[in-house]
Amino acid sequence: IIGATDMGTGCDTILAQMAAECLECKPEEIVVFGVDTDISPYDCGSYASSTTYVTGQAVVKTCESLRKKICERGAEYLGCKPEDVDFDGEYVTELATGKQISRSQIGNNVMCFSNAPLSASEAFSSPVSPPPFMVGMAEVEIDKETGVLELIDYVAVVDCGTVINPNLARVQVEGGIAQGIGMALYEDVVYNEKGKNFSNSLMQYKIPTRLDVGTIRVEFESSYEPTGPFGAKSIGEIVINTPSPAISNAIRDRSDH
């Protein structure tokens, strides 16, 4: 159970991947419950590029705590000390003798014969906010007679630390770039002298379609952030920021020639 809301960024998948990695099990064995503020643990919210970095680290801490408890219970049932066992995601094994007890058997024993649940809950708050980095390069064509501009190609290189899920990261970058292109070339809120909004529907407020954004190419520059889960940083907002200055500079360069 997590407190972060998956609003289309795929955080349920990413956080499940982190949990599976920590517990050495398959991602499909992790069940992520949809957020319900009645029962979900507190979370500051899925905004400010915080979900992977902040909630992800909370997931890692929780799984490490749960893993420790699994080893303690397994050692108890095997009749040895917790420091004398190893957990491989499926079995707790006593290192000296090779005796084993399965994860499922530990769960059954806890459910039927124990007063203490096998559960863990942790929180994470970071005193630092390591920034991601991104380079954006735009190619445009301009009709100098009419002023009509066409975006031909956009190339982005992103440093978001360890890329937890390359497919989800790539589509999030592409979506953010499309938003940035809209901010640079199409979107505007217009008011009259009395303060009435003239762009209060999608008939007046133009957002780019797939035909308007040209070719978008995305690459990742790998790095490792020691304060993040598995070395990951954020990726949400940085991708919207670069299209405006990149396109502006491309227009200036093209106009000068």
Protein language model features and the residues they cover:
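Structural motif
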Residues: I1-G3
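C-terminal catalytic domains of large/alpha subunits in multi-subunit enzymes
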Residues: M18-H257
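Thiamine diphosphate
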Residues: C11-A19
